[in-house]
Amino acid sequence: MRLTASEIAAQFGLTVVGDGATEVSGVATLAHAGTGQLSFLANPRYRPQLAETQASVVILRADDAESAQGTALVAKDPYTAFAKIAALFDVAPVRAPGIHASAVIDPTATVSPTAHVGPFVSIGAGSRVGDGCVIGAGSIIGEDCVVDDGCELIARVTLVTRVRLGKRVRVHPGAVLGADGFGLAMDAGHWIKVPQLGGVVIGDDCEIGANTCIDRGALEDTVLEEDVRVDNLVQIAHNCRIGAHSAIAGCTGIAGSAKIGRYCLLGGHVGVVGHLEICDKVVITGKSVVRNSIHEPGEYSSGTPLTDNRTWRKNAARFKQLDALARRILAVGKENQ
């Protein structure tokens, strides 16, 4: 595919600075782009690369346009504009409708004639696969699941039981949705398993990363509202609810019955304690541990920032002395009263 800068600008509401007839046929970073490729400048730290890039077209903000060496496309948000334009060059393979001969489908399951069911797929009793879905190789859809129109299970995805995917949900390889939640009760020194009778409900336009696990609820469903984006290797425990348009980065763990609001961002390796609530528009930075509910929007952090080993050891030793030091300060204060 080849597009001119003017064609791209017209399609996405951008302003051309330079030669609108400049053609691009692909995308790349500023540092590695060459002739015929489009790049973008969103982070100021990469501004020095603008003078050296070989990209034919660069998406940038208006105040950077004069520094562009070639044709520029001016956007209010260059990164978002780049994401939309790059999608034009991301040509997905065409999946022809039909069911592979090796797939095993229960007689009570229903599969749309426009769906693609790949090799070694299993679809259980009472489940339904909607129009235009792609069920990739080795995926397992258990009993009583719904995969609504336009969904894609890329490969080796497991929907255990009572999982409902909304429209246009994308699930990456190795993800497991609808496994038992971690519900246990102690009785006479032995664990008793608490039956997990709920399900998992995923809203429209969600994306679930590779090897992520979302457990089904004990009594009520585990719910991801619409347009939630979950990275790889995330654990979402039973009965959690994730608000619409939130994003969760890799290796994050969310304990049972936690409620996270709309438009929240959780960085990598965040831990969220169970049975708490996080309000809308909260940002939790990477490696933080959320131990209490959050009722005010904003950015929150915890954890120990990286420093050199010698300084860290000194600080750790002093941290152990904080209680004794606090007691001494209190004692001095009382003596001076």
Curated annotation (Swiss-Prot):
Disulfide bonds: none annotated. It comes from Xanthomonas campestris pv. campestris (strain ATCC 33913 / DSM 3586 / NCPPB 528 / LMG 568 / P 25). Transmembrane segments: none annotated. GO terms for biological process: lipid A biosynthetic process. Catalyzes the N-acylation of UDP-3-O-acylglucosamine using 3-hydroxyacyl-ACP as the acyl donor. Is involved in the biosynthesis of lipid A, a phosphorylated glycolipid that anchors the lipopolysaccharide to the outer membrane of the cell. CDD domains: LbH_LpxD. InterPro entries: Hexapep, LpxD, Trimer_LpxA-like_sf, UDP_GlcNAc_AcTrfase_non-rep. Belongs to the transferase hexapeptide repeat family. LpxD subfamily. One of its GO terms (cellular component) is membrane. This is UDP-3-O-acylglucosamine N-acyltransferase. GO terms for molecular function: N-acyltransferase activity. Pfam families: Hexapep, LpxD. Its EC number is 2.3.1.191. Keywords: Acyltransferase, Lipid A biosynthesis, Lipid biosynthesis, Lipid metabolism, Repeat, Transferase. It catalyses: a UDP-3-O-[(3R)-3-hydroxyacyl]-alpha-D-glucosamine + a (3R)-hydroxyacyl-[ACP] = a UDP-2-N,3-O-bis[(3R)-3-hydroxyacyl]-alpha-D-glucosamine + holo-[ACP] + H(+). Homotrimer. Pathway: Bacterial outer membrane biogenesis; LPS lipid A biosynthesis. NCBIfam families: lipid_A_lpxD, PRK00892.1. The active site is at residue 238.
